[in-house]
Amino acid sequence: MATYLEFIQQNEERDGVRFSWNVWPSSRLEATRMVVPLACLLTPLKERPDLPPVQYEPVLCSRPTCKAVLNPLCQVDYRAKLWACNFCFQRNQFPPAYGGISEVNQPAELMPQFSTIEYVIQRGAQSPLIFLYVVDTCLEEDDLQALKESLQMSLSLLPPDALVGLITFGRMVQVHELSCEGISKSYVFRGTKDLTAKQIQDMLGLTKPAMPMQQARPAQPQEHPFASSRFLQPVHKIDMNLTDLLGELQRDPWPVTQGKRPLRSTGVALSIAVGLLEGTFPNTGARIMLFTGGPPTQGPGMVVGDELKIPIRSWHDIEKDNARFMKKATKHYEMLANRTAANGHCIDIYACALDQTGLLEMKCCANLTGGYMVMGDSFNTSLFKQTFQRIFTKDFNGDFRMAFGATLDVKTSRELKIAGAIGPCVSLNVKGPCVSENELGVGGTSQWKICGLDPTSTLGIYFEVVNQHNTPIPQGGRGAIQFVTHYQHSSTQRRIRVTTIARNWADVQSQLRHIEAAFDQEAAAVLMARLGVFRAESEEGPDVLRWLDRQLIRLCQKFGQYNKEDPTSFRLSDSFSLYPQFMFHLRRSPFLQVFNNSPDESSYYRHHFARQDLTQSLIMIQPILYSYSFHGPPEPVLLDSSSILADRILLMDTFFQIVIYLGETIAQWRKAGYQDMPEYENFKHLLQAPLDDAQEILQARFPMPRYINTEHGGSQARFLLSKVNPSQTHNNLYAWGQETGAPILTDDVSLQVFMDHLKKLAVSSAC
């Protein structure tokens, strides 16, 4: 029989699902006492090369309030050609096409190995993909040139029938006509005035009939492909013209006097982009790709004035309620994000500048629509260029790794209710019998819209056990959950992916050990971290840390083995032993600690944490540290100051940064040039090994991490020193002068002190 670890891994590979608990407590009361909620990490479009989509539509339950999809958990009467829904127990007739089914001739959706299955919807017209570039022209010359080259390169990566459009902005906003005649025309809008969707569509001529003979018919925006085709054209038609147009783009002509910022109308440019797509291609897969090199400084959505002597808001300003533009700007971008999400479009933000660009205010545009957020120092860096190129990578079938306009519908058996979701989604406000009144994350619904997603996009979905304590579930009973994702594939097909899972119920009184053994501490850590980060958006930082600490203490009290008032007796079983250290590193992470990070950086880190899969999320919480030495092959070592030794090279992966750190002796040898001497060939190989491994990570990761190569005493060694557990500090005098690692100059508590304190509180009867 497979161990729980193997079971968890198999389910993740097959269904893209990781649950916090893999055996479920059978009553509401007991579930609340488990501390960590029953929840899962769902990767709706996890890549499955072994799962070709079936070319027919799913069979649905006939009950209007259910509409669950036929799945391997349903009871089937092959003689009568009936099936019973495992969620509402409705008996349903099979459609005529299923007339030949039997125990030995089952359709794929009834086979246990197809707990996840994908259907291709044949009906309905297919729509092309749409890419609308919104480009800031208030950039330095070399930055603008690099961005233009990246955009020109991207045209060659788009499908030939994809529609593409261009909006540029500085003090004014220009919507470019993309005709094939080679004449450059554009509509110019003032950057200080907000316009309604109707005004934008009227000004661009999107609501007028395309030809005089159509005057008699009332005009509908999406009825006039001619009108929209002036601004959105197939790549194969305007490839050359658009390449030339991009090449001719100039810096914003408005002069910028000394001591002033350029006037940048980002808010109006985005508003026009949203209005253009809203009027021409609602409910069609589209990406608005915003490229900005500085903060919005005028019009709706401005986050700072044009006076350089007045800096952009900091965390200190926000805490003192001294960020005068923040609330109004955030409201503007939230309104745009909600309109974009309602139309099934997504917004990407590519912000490259040395100072902040307003990501804090604009974050909802990417967070609510499933768009990408990329932050860098300049468009003229490999970090931006390679990250941007990676957006257009293709899968094993030659299709883009992106999907559009998805809706996620969650169905549960009657003992469960849905509390909410945390991830790149918005609520569709679909109430129903399986929706809980207690909200965790975005709740009050059983359906969410995810306008942009890729094979790693992951949502945290939280549930509530509602079965009462006095109505026991029969022995061997199983709870079931179905995830139904409707989406537009990058090949423009409409598809439906259905994942149906079941887990055993267990009585906590008699089967607590089973429930304990089925605890997935990695998934639980990420799910609790998502809750913490979600709370951090609206609560004070110390309050969130206190909440996380309380949950950890309660969990240790519930599942630890100990004698009252005796911290030395405290033990956690293997399935819980790593959880406290995940929480220790989470408390120190940039998701919850804003010290030393700008508001934009915090928004960027939190954006990625809310959408990455389990493996990447764990790296973000607790970075991975590898050691390279002459003593053997590279090996993972503790993320601890004791691992920083003079004769070692360390490679640290934090997801956002890849840090190579040379120990003191290694750094001296490199300085002396030993690697260039033939007799020290092995030293040359030692120096090269972490570089090769770092390159491998850099090639695979999206967004591309920042690459830092440093050494003992180097200024950038701080990236490593700030992440490791400070087990040796300037206060541990006994460690000085010994080969026990590097002392860290910090007042932060170490993991050992944290654990000692946790044990003390867990065994205390006062808690």
Curated annotation (Swiss-Prot):
Name used for this protein in its record: Protein transport protein Sec23B
Disease: Cowden syndrome 7: A form of Cowden syndrome, a hamartomatous polyposis syndrome with age-related penetrance. Cowden syndrome is characterized by hamartomatous lesions affecting derivatives of ectodermal, mesodermal and endodermal layers, macrocephaly, facial trichilemmomas (benign tumors of the hair follicle infundibulum), acral keratoses, papillomatous papules, and elevated risk for development of several types of malignancy, particularly breast carcinoma in women and thyroid carcinoma in both men and women. Colon cancer and renal cell carcinoma have also been reported. Anemia, congenital dyserythropoietic, 2: An autosomal recessive blood disorder characterized by morphological abnormalities of erythroblasts, ineffective erythropoiesis, normocytic anemia, iron overload, jaundice, and variable splenomegaly. Ultrastructural features include bi- or multinucleated erythroblasts in bone marrow, karyorrhexis, and the presence of Gaucher-like bone marrow histiocytes. The main biochemical feature of the disease is defective glycosylation of some red blood cells membrane proteins.
Phenotype upon changing R14W: In CDAN2; the mutant protein is unstable with less than 5% of protein detectable compared to wild-type
Family, as annotated: Belongs to the SEC23/SEC24 family. SEC23 subfamily.
GO function terms (MF aspect): GTPase activator activity; zinc ion binding
Gene3D superfamilies associated with the record: beta-sandwich domain of Sec23/24, Sec23/Sec24 helical domain, Severin, von Willebrand factor, type A domain, Zn-finger domain of Sec23/24
Native source organism of the sequence: Homo sapiens
Sites of N6-acetyllysine modification: K564
Gelsolin-like repeat extents: 634-720
Keyword Endoplasmic reticulum listed: yes
Phenotype for D239G: In CDAN2; uncertain significance; the mutant protein is expressed as the wild-type
A Pfam family it matches: Sec23_BS
Record's bilayer topology term: Peripheral membrane protein
Gene label: SEC23B
The organism's place on the tree of life at top rank: Eukaryota
PANTHER family, A to Z: PROTEIN TRANSPORT PROTEIN SEC23, PROTEIN TRANSPORT PROTEIN SEC23B
